[in-house]
Amino acid sequence: MAPACTTAHRRRAPLAAVLMLSLLPLLSPHADAAQVPWHSRTFKYVADNKDLKEVLRDLSASQSIATWISPEVTGTLSGKFETSPQEFLDDLAATYGFVWYYDGAVLRIWGANESKSATLSLGTASTKSLRDALARMRLDDPRFPVRYDEAAHVAVVSGPPGYVDTVSAIAKQVEQGARQRDATEVQVFQLHYAQAADHTTRIGGQDVQIPGMASLLRSMYGARGAPVAAIPGPGANFGRVQPIGGGSSNTFGNAAQGQGGGASGILGLPSSWFGGASSSDRVPVSPPLPGSGAAAAAGSPASVWPELSKGRRDESNPIDAGGGAELASDAPVIEADPRTNAILIRDRPERMQSYGTLIQQLDNRPKLLQIDATIIEIRDGAMQDLGVDWRFHSQHTDIQTGDGRGGQLGFNGALSGAATDGATTPVGGTLTAVLGDAGRYLMTRVSALETTNKAKIVSSPQVATLDNVEAVMDHKQQAFVRVSGYASADLYNLSAGVSLRVLPSVVPGSPNGQMRLDVRIEDGQLGSNTVDGIPVITSSEITTQAFVNEGQSLLIAGYAYDADETDLNAIPGLSKIPLVGNLFKHRQKSGTRMQRLFLLTPHVVSP
């Protein structure tokens, strides 16, 4: 029950109501979001000491609006009024101090002492999400502004209990929705053929890093993951033998402390070539085939994908998890499990299907290839005869030409017309040709020359490899040289010989089984000449590329070197007598210029 009003209050109430009616637009502006849907534009009302709750019920009943009134709303009203329903309601609220709020269905009215405040924690949701949700639902009211803290994800709302409860419920739903959207799961994708983790292979004296599936996915999706450790690699023809126990040496004095970048070391070479300087002063190593272009420093392994290596080394790149750069909050986490050769991905559930589809397309079974290599040495004169014999075979004829000294050779195979279709890039004066079935005919002719001691097959290695995986065939000699320093001595190994590297790639969709061969040949010899007691290495390098069909061969010729031979014939016993022993010896020195040929034949073992 509302308390009885005094006589003075009853007399002042109509005057105060009229005064507040004129000041209402300036004191209490209302927003469209809280606008009550009144049915008439004018409201006429006469009251004589009538209870305020009854007046409010009469107002809502005349406009067909459901109303809830708190018992804390008290007072009486007297007077005659003719104004709009909204202005009449605002006038009463300003006069008697109650607060009202329309939630879209019910007009709710509370007493002045019932207002409250609430602090809303949004969790992972942003304050913009709550602000947009209130605007879409038309629940934002400038009479009860919500204060936001974007950094802390917190909002504070003050107003009538119903409004505060409504905003709190909406904030809770927004926070739960954001938590569900940010929920992640972990899935394991088992690989069958591809490598999950980065792996390092040693090619040509270098540690070449091959990115795995995890690195590929991280580079595409900007994901987080563990960086790959750098593995140093020495040069191609010489390397430093690590001391037992991991102790450091000081062979080159100040160079070991990073001060000898410009000093000369063994054989007049910079000391940094022997690992004595910092990584920034070392000789850069070259990437794998085709063997040209800039590469990483020797302090880190070369990579067949320079873009990925750069991304792992650059600290400003968000892909590098070890660089300290901040990543996007929704960035996935991709890791490799080398033990099971699997990929572990933590991300949102709706993205997992796209990962599975991409991994399935990349994890395809590579073809198994076989590379047959034949290294042939032919005397210079015999090489010219050989060139006359096999050079003039064509597609439709089988005519053997020569100088008449060689016998007639049979050839039953059909000659391939694609013998000149190879796209080759020979170096210098080296002859590079693609042979069809005539490759077997060439071997027949070489066998004939071998019987006359004019040619010999040095080696015929065969190696199996996978598609797009480099095959390496090395036949080298090593010599270890001891180099004394100020306080210790180091061993350096010098290597020389034949290194044949072939990278085969099957052309997809080729009807003839066409393959691309990237070939790099390094041929070196430890010469008889020495510098400071260290043998001089003479080396040559050939780099070429060619497209070869199934059954064809790639011939690389024109590489010559001089071979010296010394024969000694002596009578046992007498030839060892001092002074007169030379009368019973016979020495014969001969020099021969040899031509070296490389014949490569690729085969597809399993498609």
UniProtKB/Swiss-Prot annotation:
Locations listed in the record: Cell outer membrane
GO CC terms, sorted: cell outer membrane; type II protein secretion system complex; type III protein secretion system complex
Biased composition (Low complexity): 291-306
Record region (Disordered): 277-332
Keyword field contains Protein transport: yes
Signal peptide: 1-33
Gene3D superfamilies the UniProt entry points to: 3.30.1370.120, 3.55.50.30
Keywords: Cell outer membrane, Hypersensitive response elicitation, Membrane, Protein transport, Signal, Translocation, Transport, Virulence
InterPro entries registered for this protein in UniProt: Bact_Secretion_Sys_Channel, NolW-like, NolW-like_sf, T2SS/T3SS_dom, T2SS_GspD_CS, T3S_SPI-1_N0, T3SS_OM_pore_YscC
Domain of life: Bacteria
Example GO biological process: protein secretion by the type III secretion system
Family indicated by similarity: Belongs to the bacterial secretin family. T3SS SctC subfamily.
HAMAP family according to UniProt: Type_III_secretin
Protein task: Component of the type III secretion system (T3SS), also called injectisome, which is used to inject bacterial effector proteins into eukaryotic host cells. Forms a ring-shaped multimeric structure with an apparent central pore in the outer membrane. Necessary for both basic pathogenicity and the induction of the hypersensitive response in resistant plants.
Subunit composition and interactions: The core secretion machinery of the T3SS is composed of approximately 20 different proteins, including cytoplasmic components, a base, an export apparatus and a needle. This subunit is part of the base, which anchors the injectisome in the bacterial cell envelope. Forms a stable homooligomeric complex.
Protein name as it appears in the record: Type 3 secretion system secretin
Organism: Xanthomonas euvesicatoria
Name of the gene: sctC
